[in-house]
A protein has these predicted regions:
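Extended recognition/assembly regions associated with phosphoester-bond processing machinery
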Residues: 1-484
Length: 484
């Protein structure tokens, strides 16, 4: 049995919000339930599985969302083998491990404390429910994404950092060589995925803003995370201090959670309209636009952009600057730019899954990415030959973080709706799970709404022409309409 989770984004607490402890409980409960179900075989008998491979598919530790970078003379886009850079990465990792003790304890417990256990089986293939349960070995593998890419760097300094991560998370991934970005960089992981006919990668490879020269270097998204989002929030809190009410402070803290990151300006504009007095609101918006201009002048951003620097800066300015917004078209225009940049439709990475060699040669039955924070299951192909059907499917592993999504009613002020999410993918081999090949679990938890908060409504009605009406067959018949 193979389980995959992605995009936990555990931070050092200097930006954004820490993951709730309950997330670890959900993961353990799901894995225990899935292990029990996987132990029922295709012939109807019960035979407990002996092993679960858990793949952490990148962006588990978020090494870029930290104000610690602002306190240092170095940045991730400097030479990563400078002592100052590796020391900063090490300090951030130490703080992440300390501040997220519940999540870390959960992952380590799965690997080392027998968290998942199953009843033994009788000779006739039935569970002995009253007997002491047997622990199931959990082998946890780590793959890097665009927020934890320094763990892909070689060298003694990074070996020491990986050693801490391996110890605290209970990984089977060797610490004395770079954590893999592609599965073939780690033979143990490669064999595990191949047994389950899965091709898995984080997916940042297909996002030019999150992947520049190679996976041993920074990207545009790192510059935006540190020099724009983290610096802006720190500056706003320092400049305005007590003028920020609790709701506005919370809105600023949540800025780091917004994905895609280019929607940060849209989120900030809408959040300030709801939470901040007019005078404070105007100052914050001007401060944001000023910092966007400063970031767009950075040499690092132009160097890492990978496309024409003028085109990139113009597009980033149009997406991020509140002063350049044009109402309901703002979010749509930003998403269209990202689609063109990534070569996708709707920001789904399906087109890239269709181009994978392992999909085209049918070696992989399942193509799995993360990165987008958007859980997906999309059928790719079904091949029929000699009575056998090979179905190939694309999955996105989603996220275990808060998500902000553009609303569909793009009338007036652009809005992003919030929810907390989790997503777990599971793949079976041979006769596990009664012969099934995969199972997915995705959950959404809506936000808590203060009882004193009244809904804010627009003073004007939304135009009705663009609203989808009831289907034709739902309308009343002519006879019915003629009745009094």
């Amino acid at each position: 049995m193979l389980a995959i989770i992605s995009d936990l984004h555990l931070t050092d607490g200097t930006t954004g919000m820490l993951s709730p402890p309950s997330a670890g409980d959900v993961l353990c409960d799901r894995l225990c339930d899935l292990a029990w179900r996987a132990s029922w075989r295709a012939d109807g008998s019960y035979r407990p599985i002996e092993r679960i491979d858990l793949v952490l598919l990148g962006d588990i530790l978020d090494l870029m969302s930290s104000r610690r970078w602002l306190q240092m003379p170095c940045r991730p886009w400097d030479d990563p083998h400078l002592a100052a850079v590796s020391d900063t990465v090490g300090g951030i990792v130490d703080e992440i491990l300390r501040r997220n003790v519940d999540a870390i304890r959960t992952l380590r417990g799965l690997a080392t404390e027998g968290t998942v256990s199953l009843p033994p089986a009788t000779a006739s293939g039935q569970p002995v429910l009253e007997a002491e349960e047997l622990p199931v070995a959990v082998c946890t593998h780590y793959m890097v994404g665009n927020r934890d890419w320094p763990l892909h760097l070689g060298g003694t300094a990074y070996d020491l950092i990986r050693h801490k991560v391996t110890h605290h998370l209970g990984l089977v991934t060797p610490y004395n060589r770079p954590f893999p970005h592609a599965a073939d960089e780690c033979p143990e992981l490669f064999d595990t995925l191949r047994r389950h006919r899965v091709l898995a990668r984080h997916g940042d490879l297909y996002d030019p803003l999150s992947y520049a020269l190679d996976r041993d270097s920074a990207s545009v998204s790192d510059v935006l995370a540190i020099e724009l989002v983290a610096r802006f929030v720190q500056h706003a809190e320092g400049e305005l201090g007590d003028q920020l009410n609790p709701a506005t402070r919370m809105a600023l803290a949540e800025l780091e959670q917004v994905r895609p990151m280019l929607l940060a300006g849209s989120y900030l504009d809408a959040a300030l309209e709801r939470t901040a007095p007019a005078a404070v609101r105007g100052r914050i918006k001007r401060m944001w636009d000023y910092m966007v201009d400063q970031v767009l002048c950075l040499e690092a951003l132009r160097r890492l952009g990978g496309i024409d620097s003028g085109e990139l800066t113009d597009a980033l300015a149009a997406a991020l600057k509140i002063g350049r917004r044009d109402g309901q078209a703002w979010i749509r225009r930003t998403l269209e730019f990202l689609e063109r940049l990534q070569g996708t439709q709707g920001l789904s990475l399906v087109p890239h899954a269709l181009a994978e060699a392992d999909f085209r040669n049918r070696r992989a039955r399942h193509i799995v990415y993360g990165h987008t924070h958007q859980p997906e299951m999309v059928p790719l192909d079904a091949s029929h030959a000699d009575g056998f059907v090979l179905s190939q499917t694309y999955f996105n592993a989603g996220s275990w973080r808060r998500r902000y999504q553009p609303t569909q009613m793009l009338v007036g002020q652009p809005e992003l709706a919030v929810s907390d999410s989790f997503s777990l993918l599971c793949f079976y081999q041979a006769d596990e799970r009664s012969g099934r090949t995969y199972e997915t679990w995705t959950g959404m938890l809506g936000p808590a709404i203060p009882t004193t908060e009244m809904p804010v409504t627009s003073g004007s009605a939304a135009p009705g022409a663009s609203i989808v009406r009831a289907p034709q067959f739902a309308s009343r018949s002519a006879a019915a309409r003629s009745m009094p």
